[in-house]
Amino acid sequence: MAVNNISKKRKFVGDGVFKAELNEFLTRELAEDGYSGVEVRVTPTRSEIIIMATRTQSVLGEKGRRIRELTSVVQKRFNIPEQSVELYAEKVATRGLCAIAQAESLRYKLIGGLAVRRACYGVLRFIMESGARGCEVVVSGKLRGQRAKSMKFVDGLMIHSGDPCNDYVNTATRHVLLRQGVLGIKVKIMLPWDQQGKNGPKKPQPDHILVTEPKDEPAPLEPTSDIRSLAPAPLPQPVAAVA
């Protein structure tokens, strides 16, 4: 039996293309169910695809019918043998700290006819109340009239450069088709530092300074002195008088 030797470079590229196509497919299928991302875990026996969403019950469907349909579609689309892939639905821990969920929420608010400024301030307030350190919402397109422009709404702290951006900044981009044209939505959320790693990265920022409380020193039982001096010279002995 011939074994196909695939180089590491081709394997990494293939895994990246698979995840990108899978993410695009699930974004179209589960946009109304609060889809917030996908994670692929490969085990020796099978591959596990974890779908993160805000409404997991809608992703699963009645008696797991919809998740089985998605599994069948993924197997046919990517030529995966049966019983070698399993789909799971995981609920997003904090919806306000997920940029994809907030971008979709803003998208449906604009489709519903809500004013741009009011919709953006509502999303901004919800993100900050969820514990984010900062957020930025940008809406661009034909907001008023025929001339395109962009509106930016900022609150809190936001970093724009350096390696911590990869860990602390969550970004999402969406497009919404309205009567006047297509609007672009960009949401950036600055995550907080979380030692447990639930709501943010475990690794602190390079400029973060942690001040620890001083330890309580036990009270001394005997009086002591920090001044260290030489031992005192012996006192001169009295000399007896000679008669």
UniProtKB/Swiss-Prot annotation:
Spans through the membrane: none
GO cellular component: cytosolic small ribosomal subunit; nucleus
Domain KH type-2: 22-93
PROSITE patterns per record: KH_TYPE_2, RIBOSOMAL_S3
Region of interest: Disordered: 195-243
Annotated InterPro entries: KH_dom-like_a/b, KH_dom_type_2, KH_sf_prok-type, Ribosomal_S3_C_sf, Ribosomal_uS3_C, Ribosomal_uS3_CS, Ribosomal_uS3_euk/arc
GO BP, sorted A to Z: positive regulation of apoptotic signaling pathway; translation
GO terms of molecular function: RNA binding; structural constituent of ribosome
SUPFAM superfamilies recorded: Prokaryotic type KH domain (KH-domain type II) (SSF54814), Ribosomal protein S3 C-terminal domain (SSF54821)
Source organism superkingdom: Eukaryota
Keyword NAD: no
The entry's keywords: Ribonucleoprotein, Ribosomal protein, RNA-binding
Annotated family: Belongs to the universal ribosomal protein uS3 family.
NCBIfam families: PRK04191.1, uS3_euk_arch
PANTHER family to which the protein is assigned, alphabetical: 30S/40S RIBOSOMAL PROTEIN S3, SMALL RIBOSOMAL SUBUNIT PROTEIN US3
Name of the protein in question: Small ribosomal subunit protein uS3
Origin species: Manduca sexta
